[in-house]
Amino acid sequence: MSVNTAATLYFGYVLTEEQVKSLPDEDFAYLMEELEFLHNTDCYREDYSSFIFGVRLGRTNDGIISINPHVDYPTYVKIIWYYEKYFNIKNEAPKHLLAHCWS
């Protein structure tokens, strides 16, 4: 995948499971660096899901970003799994997260 992975995540690019699996090592490492940065910012709250704001999430009018489980949950879980594997973190992925950091 010849893209700046983290940047495309910011713009709402949807990564499929196969695309995540096939990321070159360099792209995957860069993505993990970006996730770690978000993990350590003020936008990081009680969970680590804020990094995924651009990936298969929908923004509601009340400032909440929510998962669309009918379409998006498998990819969400897959990318969470990659995050857990890389950082050796185990946590329950929340269904909602505050979006003010991204507005």
Residues of each region from the PLM?
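Acidic (Asp/Glu-rich) sequence patches and key acidic residues
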Residues: M1-W81, K85-A93, W102-S103
